[in-house]
Amino acid sequence: MAVFLKSIIFAPMKEFLQILRRFVPPYKKYLGLSILFNILSAVLNIFSFAALIPILQILFKVDGGIRVNEYMHWNGDWGSIKEVATNNLYYYIQEFIVVHSASTALLVIGIFLAFMTFLKTGAYFLSSATIIPIRTGIVRDIRNQIYQKINSLSLGFFSEERKGDIIARMSGDVQEVENSIMSSLDMLFKNPILILFYFVTLICISWQLTLFTILFVPPFGWFMGVVGKKLKAHSIEAQALWSDTMSMVEETLGGLRIIKAFCAEEKMNKHFNQVNSSYRDNIMRVNIRQQMAHPMSEFLGTILIVVVLWFGGILVLDYGRIDGPTIIFYLVMLYSIINPLKEFSKASYNIPKGLASMERIDKILQAEVEIKDKETPEHISSFEHQIEFRHVSFAYTDRKSAELVYVLKDINLVIPKGKTVALVGQSGSGKSTMVDLIPRYYDVQEGEVLIDGINVKDLAVHDLRMLIGNVNQEAILFNASFKDNIRFGKTDATDEEIANAAKIANAYEFITKSEHGFDTNIGDRGGRLSGGQRQRVSIARAILKNPPILILDEATSALDTESERLVQDALEKLMKTRTTVAVAHRLSTIKHADEICVLHEGRIVERGTHDELIRKDGYYKKLHDMQQV
């Protein structure tokens, strides 16, 4: 038995138990109730089946129908408690038969059996019902933890991970954990109790027969443990292929226009079919192995029953150690213990699949949060003086060479309060990276970024970002109403404040003309709106937040002339009295900036006003002339 438990439980289930230690504590009361009802179920099951012995003795007239014994006093020297209890039970049945007849005694014992079975099944139901809140609660908690972790991770994490893979972990892997691991909770908290009580009962009935039975259990456990380990390896591969499938679906949905424009439907279909077929082949192997659990445990259980029948028959026929009804009761108890053991074997196939998924989930849950507060961060509620880049250098690690590739090199820049500074340059020169350092989406490798003389690493991240408003090239909106999108950064805003923000952003007119006004749903990512409308809604959102620092990252580069005019007008209203850092592709939009910094290969190569830079006849002048052609 010990070897069996080691191969079936402690090998594949050690990780399982570690997972439960992480997630079960909030549900201890349900766990306690489940254990209580499982104990009741086991005890009631034993007593209900124990009623079979006198029934069989009456039916088959063993010892003349029932043993004839004298009543034993409990304080007498009559042997063990078991012997006294058994003797007195038969004594009362014997007296009942004498008074009421054997058929009546049979009916009463049958009613007792039915009543005990009713209580047993009730306890069994309650034990399973109390597991459900644990199972569903843990799955909910895992999803919450993944989502919260996603929100806490830095943007750098997602530049190295595919969105489809993350979605697959949130959906497919969590679902697999629920199906494979959480479905085994009932097995874990119920079956050990049943096995313990039934095993003790088997020893009480016949320790010789039980000892003989134990000899056959370890080989069964070893076989199932080996299969379970192989199943986990295949499951990890299957879940990785599922992530590839989800990633391709996500990429396809985001690139449908390009796919259609290049007539690449057939090409993408073939590629998806290859990925999907690989997943199918792998998951098929996993499921075939999983389906082995029931027939294999059924076959091994039958072998065990046959062996016990043979050895038990010897004890009955040759030695007379136990009688026929007792051996039948023993077989019933043995069959009862086989079912929980079958569940363990089934779990040894199921749980490795869930553990493989949990490994992938933990890659997110245990990922290091690089951007976080210090133990004692400085708090800030207002912006008073300036933003400063002091000898700032920023690099990312190249995946192939593992070397640092510098995007920014020794940047020095002071942005006084109330001023507008524009960053221009070719694609890849580091403009967007530079503005991403202000709200601390990334941390610099060298130098420091300061707000009012305080390093942003020393500030509370929440306080820092509450000072900053963002309007990006791609207006990021949510599948909600106009109202909910505009008040995203200020949930307590009044309807009047929301309307005023929309008016300043030149969005009020088209919002009020929509079907339900400010309560109109704008669709996934604002898909029901034009590019200019989406941008004006995002500007209204920034206006309502009313931040002292504003970051504009090519906010008008993807718009037509009319939309650009409306958006530019809204931006100019937004920029009044605010400190603004603008990344610009169209130089015409930043002519009036207080200072323009020209970036080239990660360095500031020129700086000054528009007129000053034109007179320099340098890099900025070349960019300007190219846009005039």
Regions found by a protein language model. Name each.
Residues 4-9, 374, 380-629:
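ABC-type nucleotide-binding domain
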Residues 56, 115, 146, 150, ...:
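Hydrophobic/aromatic residues within transmembrane alpha-helices of membrane transport systems
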Residues 1-50, 59-113, 119, 126-131, ...:
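Membrane-integrated ABC transporters
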Residues 10-21, 57, 64-93, 129-175, ...:
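Extended non-transmembrane interhelical loops and adjacent amphipathic helices
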Residues 201-215, 224, 289-359, 364-365:
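Helix-loop-helix
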Residues 45-53, 107, 112-163, 167, ...:
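Juxtamembrane helix-loop junctions of ABC transporter transmembrane domains
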Residues 25-29, 155-156, 172-181, 185, ...:
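An intracellular "coupling" helix at the cytosolic face of ABC transporter transmembrane type-1 domains
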Residues 36, 123, 127, 171-216, ...:
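Hydrophobic alpha-helical transmembrane segments of ABC transporter permease domains
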